[in-house]
């Protein structure tokens, strides 16, 4: 079995309730042959909102030595019908809104999403935070600049955020970097 599929769209609404809504313009190609699926192309995220009231399921991954069994005690093997190879550029407009865990703001940037068969997903690129607010411990901070950079495995980004707050009756600005 072989297939070569192109998928192009403009301003498509995508949602993953209750946390994520997006408007995207995908330009993707999928090639299927034997036991391989290769996905490449570009996805433009025109608008979006991510709400993180609580950490999503899977935020804390299981140890590699965990074995999952069924009711009879037999190991459940997660067989995939295809070895998946991914090479997709994701361009996120800075109108993407994020809310949760004390943060409200926007982010945007470009990420290259790559994955080889049976390997972890990798991200390369950076997201900028053009504006935002962070509230914790009765303190309200304005995010004046921020960058989330990825250079490999997706769960290990480099985060650089500068947040400040003005003390109203004084000419003082305090913050964290």
Q: Model segments located where?
A:
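Strand-loop-strand
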Residues: 1-177
